[in-house]
Amino acid sequence: MAEADTERRPHIPVLLRPLLAAVAPVEGTWLDGTFGAGGYARGLLEAGADRVIGVDRDPLALKMASGWAGDYGDRLRLVAGTFSQLDSHAGAPLDGVVLDLGVSSMQLDLAERGFSFQKDGPLDMRMSQEGESAADLVNTASEETLADILYHYGEERASRRIARAIVEARAAAPITRTLALAEIVARCLPRPKPGQMHPATRSFQAIRIAVNAEFSELVEGLEAAERALRPGGRLAVVTFHSLEDRIVKRFLQLRSGGEGQGNRYAPETRADAPRFTLPLRRAISPDEAELAENPRARSARLRVGVRTDAPAGKVDPQALGTPLIPKKGRR
C-alpha cells in the first residue's frame, strides 16, 4: 500500500546529508528539477557545485526564491518549467540531477493552493497553477474514472464507494472546497483510531497525481535525466510513497542492466549496455535523528544512479510498473 504523503514536506530538505554523501564529490553543473524552497540547490552549492540550475513548474516557488537567489550570483539560475524537459533546460551535459518528488511543504501549508485536507481552501491542487484543477476533475469526471483514479493513484480500497459519494454530492452542488471533499470521503470510511492517517489521505493523493500528471512527468523526467547526464554524472531521486518509488527503483534496475535480454548468449550491443551503475545496494531512509527532527520525512527514500557512456533511450512506462488509468470511461 502507498504510504501517506500528504503530511510529509518539511522546509528542511529531506535526506540532504546522505544525498550529498552518496553523490560526492559535488562539482560541476547540477540541475535541481524540483526547486521548491531551494533547499537542495543551496545544499549543492554549499557542497561545492560550480553551478545549479533550479527548475520548478510552480511560479510561486521561483517568486519566493527571488529574495535570496541573487546571493549566489550566476552560480544559480532559475527556470520556470517541468523536469520532464530538464535536458532542454540544461543546455549542456550535466554533472548531476536531483529530483525531490511530490507536493512541497509550501504547497501544503498554503490553504489557497488547495492541496490540504486539513485546511479549508479552493479545491485546486495545480502545481503549475495552469490547466484543469482538482475541482474541474472532481465535478466532471465520470464515476468510473474517479474510482479508477482513486484506486490506481491512491491505492484506495474504497474507491468505488467514494466515487459514488462524490457523484451524488456534486449532483446537489459543485464540490469546490478542500474540506467539503475531505468530509465526503471521510463519511465513506471508518473513523480513524488515534495515530492513524486521515481518511482522505489516499484520495487527495490520487486526485493530486491525476491533476498534475505526476507519473507521466516522472517517467519522462527520468528519461530526460538519462539524456542530460554526462558519463559519470549522478542522478539522485527522493520519493515519498511506494508508487513513485517503485517507478524509480524499476527504472534504475532496468537501466543498470536488469532488462533481461532475450538471449543471454547473444553479444551485447551498445543499445543493450547499462545506462547507469548503482552505487547504493538499496534505498536510503531517514535515520532516527532526522525523524526526530522532522517526522514528515518518515516515508522518504533516496535512490542514486551513476550514468555510463551508453546511449540514452526510451523506456516503456508499463515496464516500470507505472499505474495507468484505463481509457474507457475517462469522461
Curated annotation (Swiss-Prot):
Protein name, UniProt field: Ribosomal RNA small subunit methyltransferase H
GO cellular component, one term: cytoplasm
Reaction(s) this enzyme catalyzes, per UniProt: cytidine(1402) in 16S rRNA + S-adenosyl-L-methionine = N(4)-methylcytidine(1402) in 16S rRNA + S-adenosyl-L-homocysteine + H(+)
Record gene name: rsmH
GO MF annotation, one: rRNA (cytosine-N4-)-methyltransferase activity
Catalytic EC class: transferase
Family designation: Belongs to the methyltransferase superfamily. RsmH family.
CDD domains per the UniProt record, alphabetical: AdoMet_MTases (cd02440)
EC numbers for this chain: 2.1.1.199
GO term, biological process aspect, one: rRNA base methylation
Ligand binding (S-adenosyl-L-methionine): 38-40, 56, 83, 100, 107
Pfam families: Methyltransf_5
Region described as Disordered: 287-331
